[in-house]
Amino acid sequence: MSSAVRIVEKQLDEILAIARNPAQIRNAGTLAHVDHGKTTTTDSLLMGAGLLSPKVAGKALAMDFVAIEQLRQMTVKAANISLYFEYGGKPYLVNFVDTPGHVDFTGHVTRSLRVMDGGLVVVDSVEGVMTQTETVVRQALEEYVRPVLFINKIDRLIKELRLSPQEIQQRILTIVKDFNALIDMFAPPEFKDKWKVDPAKGQVALGSALHKWGITIPMAQKAGLKFSNIVDAYEKGYVDKLGEEFPLYKTLLTMIIEHVPPPNVAQKYRIPRLWRGDLNSEVGKAMLEADPNGPTVIAVSKVNKDPHAGLIATGRVFSGTIREGDEVYIIGRKMKKKVLQTYIYMGPTRIIVPYMPAGNIVALMGVDEARAGDTLVDPRLTEVPPFEKMRYIAEPVVTVAIEPKNPAELAKLVEALKDLVIEDPTLDLKIDQETGQILLSGVGTLHLEIATWLLKERAKTEFTVSPPLIRFRETVRERSQVWEGKSPNKHNKLYFYVEPLDETTVELIATKEITEEQDPRERAKILREKAGWDTDEARGIWAIDDRYFNVIVDKTTGIQYLREIRDYIVQGFRWAMEAGPLAQEPMRGVKVVLVDAVVHEDPAHRGPAQIMPATKNAIFAAVLSARPTLLEPLVRLDIKVAPDYIGSVTSVLNKHRGKILDMTQQEYMAYLRAELPVLESFTISDELRAAAAGKIFWSMQFARWAPYPESMLVDFVKQLRKKKGLKEDIPKPTDFVEVF
């Protein structure tokens, strides 16, 4: 039992020695559906590393170090820890990230995956593979992160469901089968077979994080342990003995070391997926090998505000060695910054280290301008392409208005809000410059509840929060006629039409396969081959709105002075896309096309104050003549319920405009998959519980945007406009432009 019980001070020198050898490093993290036991599992690992007393492991939630996390017994942010572990006579460094399981916090999962090579997927033995399990496994596989499986809460099968040893075995095989089905569905083709988990090979652990024991099949066979022995341990009260003989931390760390690849192996297949540069260049080769002597390249995965040290950027060193005092160049922000301090994490504590080589996770002080998703490089490498942009699965669809009780403290509140958005880019902050109104949007009500709680902690000022409002999107259903937008001084004329942007292009923008920064020829090729675009039109793209998924295309030829006002037209386009003409909701899936222009020769008469309104007004007129409509966000519900209650659960869903997509039945459980408007989801929890007498599990996650029902559209838009203090009547194109 001497595997890893030494305390961190003694370990620092040893950790640095191991950090120089990529073969002895593992970068992994927990991934799971909410409440399946990730953080309790991670606590068990901390105990094994001597960082947590055995008495409190399983109860401590040590990785939940934001006070509200311990209060709610759930993880809302991703936390890091470096663990020292001896296996097979060799010391290893396991850099571990604990991530949230609640659907409202998938943004934290997305960012964590960039630094991981392996994901320990924790599944509750009773609930099995749930929606969020599917989401995080899919995200992991998109980032080429290899999953291994821990089936947790085996005690529930024995104590709650009272299953026999044979039935427990059957339940485990069902979960493994469901898990492998996800890998079959989402894994990159070359890993579909290699990455499926096999209990016989020790790629699946079973246990109870609460009772601190865990085994794999090879371990059980070696020790002569049978399922009947585990059932006996619970029934006869000697479960502590299981924890002593088969400590969970040892089982999980062994599984991670055996089945999660080291950085120098993982980077060989991850770098071609995460980075579009030349793999044969000096920096490309260094990253493929995780070479500590190569040029410095770091992918930033998160940024946190420290009250004493300012902004701390955490990321993975993919090549080179970062040292205190080094200069780094932030690609995309085009600036150099000096690293003032380098750290590794021990839960909430940052430990200062003199350097950190390739393959490791590091925290940096001094690079204040860096943001999650940024790439930091050696200052000589200013032309190197950055890592692929991160793709967030959930979109901010719920909004609250925030107002300081004391107007004099507005600036203080805004400052704290801006810091929150830096830390969590899935939050969306809008401040109306004229009215001073602050709108904060998140992916769900819980996301906003936690954000406002953190705001209260940090801003140290009182404020009010409005009831949550749902965000909608505006779009068009057909091509409009051409509309003329005149500048306020009447010296410039711009001619636009709009049409729906096809779903394939929207998906290419969402997955970052096409971006504004891309080489226009490369982008045109992708659009031609995958979305059927005409080559000239694809090359004419001026800007891509990757926040709301719209594009602006220039189809003009030979217009004098057009190049000089291009940036102002793009700014006008972005302005129009942020709040459309129907109800000031963001536009989505719109292609804006410029077909002609008359531009004044004198720069004084064609500035932004002239060109931006002309652009916006013409776009608004075009939108209103293209059968505009509202899109509402839908959530997907995955429901497990006792078969007797299917009827009552279905009627609750029907009452809330829900639609059942799929239904299957097994011996004890019925499985329903449904879609439901977010607008209808606020009270659904209590109603479902009541309808099924509490015998129900369900999970929700953002599914898609769908047109609001046509029969109710006009009344609903009027209602929405009234709420926002706008004139109730829907505007006409002529409210924005003169007919020409």
From Swiss-Prot:
Cytoplasm in keyword set: yes
Family as reported in the entry's similarity comment: Belongs to the TRAFAC class translation factor GTPase superfamily. Classic translation factor GTPase family. EF-G/EF-2 subfamily.
Record's subcellular location: Cytoplasm
Binding-site list for GTP: 32-39, 98-102, 152-155
InterPro entries per the UniProt record, alphabetical: EFG_II (IPR041095), EFG_III/V (IPR035647), EFG_V-like (IPR000640), EFTu-like_2 (IPR004161), P-loop_NTPase (IPR027417), Ribosomal_Su5_D2-typ_SF (IPR020568), Ribsml_uS5_D2-typ_fold_subgr (IPR014721), Small_GTP-bd (IPR005225)
GO cellular component terms listed in the entry, alphabetical order: cytosol; ribonucleoprotein complex
Origin species: Pyrobaculum arsenaticum (strain DSM 13514 / JCM 11321 / PZ6)
Nucleotide-binding keyword on record: yes
Name of protein: Elongation factor 2
The entry's keywords: Cytoplasm, Elongation factor, GTP-binding, Nucleotide-binding, Protein biosynthesis
Occurrences of domain tr-type G (ranges): 23-264
Residues recorded with modification Diphthamide: 605
Function: Catalyzes the GTP-dependent ribosomal translocation step during translation elongation. During this step, the ribosome changes from the pre-translocational (PRE) to the post-translocational (POST) state as the newly formed A-site-bound peptidyl-tRNA and P-site-bound deacylated tRNA move to the P and E sites, respectively. Catalyzes the coordinated movement of the two tRNA molecules, the mRNA and conformational changes in the ribosome.
